[in-house]
């Protein structure tokens, strides 16, 4: 398995393309000068395209991925209705979802042979809309509205339209600020990192009565932390055994173990990392974590070690200015 790491640096308007070697070392393959401030990125399900959200002209860019080394070639673009804070796709590669924090909306853009077309759906009124996360069954779009302490739930139709589910939302505690999400591989649980109180909510996707329930809320900060909480990103290992979340004020990555059924998290440790870690990701083998320091202008690679899933720094690399996003492709 070959793996490629992509990092987006909006201040220098660059995408760095790295080959992730089997021993965890990174080799620079390409630096792409992008037509704007590149921020959120996602790889298409078929591994053939990288989609990138850019500002200040709100667009989604499509880059074709070279199979042998992961290098990028520009392939197309489409306008977006709001400044892209987070982008994702459905599991079949038919649609791109874009969440806009500033414009408070989520949109659906169709993909034709991998290239983005004209937006077909926009849902507004989502204050602080921070991500769009398709459920494992490809039917429900979970959309955290950070400023409203709620996660809105939409049914995705076959033609890409969104309609409110029943229930239409789930709510967090006041002041939590739900931000980003991941789902357990067993498709039974979702995990949301809350930006404003740096906590993790564990959501049971459907209990026997068909309800969605928060079954655990866990603090992700060290007991002696007294600063302003400012959580950012969250990811889970491919086997579902460990979960990681980062806080930008403390510049740490918190390590969690996950119970076998996915319902319970336990803190295993806190890893100091690059200054102001806005984004990070895991490789597809579950062996390495790559974190980006928005204020250090570097990325760091960590070994994931032992049953606790603790992190050991393996290497550190300069990237562009203000790196904010990391994605990993396996091909």
Swiss-Prot record:
Q: Which EC main class describes this enzyme?
A: hydrolase
Q: In which pathway does it act?
A: Carbohydrate degradation; pentose phosphate pathway; D-ribulose 5-phosphate from D-glucose 6-phosphate (oxidative stage): step 2/3
Keywords for this protein: Carbohydrate metabolism, Glucose metabolism, Hydrolase
Give the catalytic activity: 6-phospho-D-glucono-1,5-lactone + H2O = 6-phospho-D-gluconate + H(+)
* Entry's transmembrane regions: none
What GO cellular component is one of the record's annotations?
A: cytosol
Q: Does the keyword 4Fe-4S apply?
A: no
> What's a single GO BP term from this record?
pentose-phosphate shunt, oxidative branch
Signal peptide location: none
Which GO terms label this protein's molecular function in UniProt?
Answer: 6-phosphogluconolactonase activity
Any one Pfam family here would be Lactonase
Q: Which NCBIfam families match?
A: PRK11028.1
The family annotation for this protein states: Belongs to the cycloisomerase 2 family.
Q: Which PANTHER family match?
A: 6-PHOSPHOGLUCONOLACTONASE (PTHR30344:SF1), 6-PHOSPHOGLUCONOLACTONASE-RELATED (PTHR30344)
Q: What does this protein do?
A: Catalyzes the hydrolysis of 6-phosphogluconolactone to 6-phosphogluconate.
Q: What is this protein called?
A: 6-phosphogluconolactonase
